[in-house]
């Protein structure tokens, strides 16, 4: 194998069941998905030098390979994360023309190969042979074993995994799907962590503890809503408006007694009559300013509230004629 340009086709000797000396090399790349190899129906004893497994994708490894056989036992977990199917072609020199070359496209099947291998002794028995790749090791010198192969003519091959690196670096187990990138894998691992499972319930902040007053609703009185800021506007009937306009034509300001009397006759409350007269006076002033109506000399502008307050006080106080007013009345009557 060329050390300058190496497609990482790692050759593994095949130990046939009958003769341990006649071995042919099977080349496997170090970057392919987990593959189950099926043995062909030829005798393992007749395997020549042309009996090879050729596997598709290779990686560029710049450092030479040093082959060492270690005679001690060590755990070798092997699972990898790969993408795409692996194309395996198998050809045998002793097979006839009718046999030809077989191509295997193995699906993705993540197995964890965790075995303890003793190179000097027997080899562990396992199910369909699984070799997994996608070795993401740096460009350092790789010390590896030749993986042994033992079995019959049609038996399932067994493999002993390499240990890469000068200190026999153990490869991490990849338990995620092949479609996930490392970023997504780390995100899923963070989501599956026990800290997220035992997350605290919703926190209560200070602004959530503030008690807000509910909106005020107007209380329904005898004739409608009373004295509330969000009181509904009173809709007066035509008869009520006619009587109020008639009273406004004679008296711009009402005494409390007269206001109670008008409210009782029109089926309104005292507050409604008072507010109607206030609005009517403001409307009158607006029209006078616009020149639509002549200025009424009854009360000077600006003294409306004083006149209304004085009328209320006079209506509430007992009607006791003063001595001056009585003398003035007698004088006017004598004249």
Curated annotation (Swiss-Prot):
**GO molecular function terms noted in the UniProt entry:** DNA-binding transcription activator activity, RNA polymerase II-specific; DNA-binding transcription factor activity, RNA polymerase II-specific; identical protein binding; RNA polymerase II cis-regulatory region sequence-specific DNA binding; sequence-specific DNA binding; sequence-specific double-stranded DNA binding
Domain of life the protein comes from: Eukaryota
Please list the residue ranges that the record marks as compositionally biased, kind Low complexity.
313-328
Q: Which GO terms describe its biological process?
A: abducens nerve formation; anatomical structure morphogenesis; artery development; artery morphogenesis; cochlea development; cochlea morphogenesis; cognition; embryonic neurocranium morphogenesis
Identify the main location: nucleus
Q: Which residues bind DNA?
A: 229-288
Which residues lie within the region annotated Disordered?
61-80, 281-335
Q: Where is the composition biased (Basic and acidic residues)?
A: 303-312
Family as reported in the entry's similarity comment: Belongs to the Antp homeobox family. Labial subfamily.
Functional summary from the UniProt entry: Sequence-specific transcription factor. Regulates multiple developmental processes including brainstem, inner and outer ear, abducens nerve and cardiovascular development and morphogenesis as well as cognition and behavior. Also part of a developmental regulatory system that provides cells with specific positional identities on the anterior-posterior axis. Acts on the anterior body structures. Seems to act in the maintenance and/or generation of hindbrain segments. Activates transcription in the presence of PBX1A and PKNOX1.
What name is this protein filed under?
A: Homeobox protein Hox-A1
What organism, scientifically named, is this protein from? Answer: Homo sapiens
Q: Kindly list the organism's lineage.
A: Eukaryota, Metazoa, Chordata, Craniata, Vertebrata
Report the gene name: HOXA1
